[in-house]
UniProtKB/Swiss-Prot annotation:
Similarity section: Belongs to the REF/SRPP family.
Segments of this protein annotated with the region Disordered: 208-240
InterPro entries xref list: REF
The protein, known as: REF/SRPP-like protein At1g67360
């Protein structure tokens, strides 16, 4: 009976399965980080274990009573999402469907990243997991922020504001990086988990993106000039 109930829940979660997966991964990450902090708490370890025991005694009966509620609620919400999705697919314009599909892709990618983060935490410990997260953060910031800024920078008001704001942002980002590096070298190991702002990489990526856009504009301009010249020659030929 329990197996049938479990299978029916798994089949029912057609839209929100990623929520359950993400929750499991988050709980696993928090558990690993808590265990790491407890093992490295030094003289406070015994006090932490006493508090942990007291909390477990109080929370366990409550958990046993309500443990099935979140899953039942998730199944109910999943059914509602299914109804809304059907109506949306039936009546929504193509552009809206495209946006929703892109959101689904992002959610899928985020779930994959969460799985990789938990895997790193389990195999290499919290530091390896944070290093992985910092690498992914750096890649995301460099690629996506540069593309967005390159598009926005085409508008004159934003371009003028950016010329003033970017040097200030670069200055404070460098100050932040120096502070994190100095504190890490002084022995504050937890500070070493903080990601650095990849200022140089962002600048290089922006220059590359800007050059690519300018090259694309020049190519379009040359094509326009060629077309105009061809039209002019054709007009001259017709007049003769």
């Amino acid at each position: 009976m329990e197996t049938e109930k479990k299978n029916s829940k798994e089949v029912a979660l057609k839209h929100l399965a990623f929520v359950r997966i993400a929750t499991i991964h988050i709980l696993a990450s928090v558990s690993n980080l808590y265990e790491y902090a407890k093992q490295n708490s030094g003289p406070l370890k015994s006090a932490v274990e006493k508090v942990e025991g007291a909390v477990t005694t109080v929370v366990t009966p409550v958990y046993q009573k309500f443990k099935d509620v979140p899953d039942s609620l998730l199944v109910f919400l999943d059914h509602k999402v299914g109804e809304v999705s059907y109506k949306f697919d039936e009546h929504a314009p193509p552009m809206a469907k495209k946006v929703v599909n892109q959101a689904h892709v992002l959610i899928y990618k985020a779930t994959e990243k969460a799985q990789s983060f938990v895997k790193e935490a389990r195999t290499g410990g919290p530091k390896a997991a944070f290093n992985y997260a910092a690498t992914e953060y750096k890649f995301f910031v460099v690629t996506n922020s540069v593309k967005v800024w390159a598009k926005l920078n085409q508008y004159k008001p934003i371009h003028a504001m950016g010329d003033k704001a970017l040097p200030v942002a670069a200055h404070f980002s460098s100050r932040y990086n120096d502070l994190v590096t100095d504190m890490t070298n002084m022995g504050y190991s937890l500070v070493g988990y903080l990601p650095l702002v990849p200022v140089d990489d962002i600048v290089k990526a922006y220059e590359k993106e800007d050059a690519r856009r300018k090259k694309g504009g020049d190519t379009a301009g040359k094509k326009g000039e060629t077309t105009d010249a061809a039209d002019g020659d054709k007009s001259s030929s017709d007049s003769e």
